[in-house]
Amino acid sequence: MCMPCFTTDPNMANKCRDCCGGGKKCFGPQCLCNR
């Protein structure tokens, strides 16, 4: 699991993708790489 996702951060989706190394996304308050 990557860093928490905050909707106030406009770059959060990109950070999640970078951390997951692909097209994964934020689910709720967390960045989940197994979906």
From Swiss-Prot:
Organism: Mesobuthus eupeus (Lesser Asian scorpion)
Keywords: Chloride channel impairing toxin, Disulfide bond, Ion channel impairing toxin, Knottin, Secreted, Toxin, Voltage-gated chloride channel impairing toxin
Summary of the tissues where the protein is detected: Expressed by the venom gland.
Pfam families noted in UniProt: Toxin_5 (PF05294)
Domain remarks in the Swiss-Prot or TrEMBL record: The presence of a 'disulfide through disulfide knot' structurally defines this protein as a knottin.
Subcellular location: Secreted
Family that this chain belongs to: Belongs to the short scorpion toxin superfamily. Chloride channel inhibitor family.
GO molecular function, a single term: toxin activity
SUPFAM superfamilies in the record: Scorpion toxin-like
Protein name from the UniProt record: Insectotoxin-I5
CC annotations in GO: extracellular region
Species lineage: Eukaryota, Metazoa, Ecdysozoa, Arthropoda, Chelicerata
Disulfide bonds: 2-19, 5-26, 16-31, 20-33
Purpose: Toxin with unknown function in healthy organisms. On glioma cells, interacts with chloride channels (probably ClC-3/CLCN3) and MMP2 at the surface of glioma cells. This complex is then internalized via caveolae, thus inhibiting the chloride channels necessary for cell shrinkage and tumor propagation.
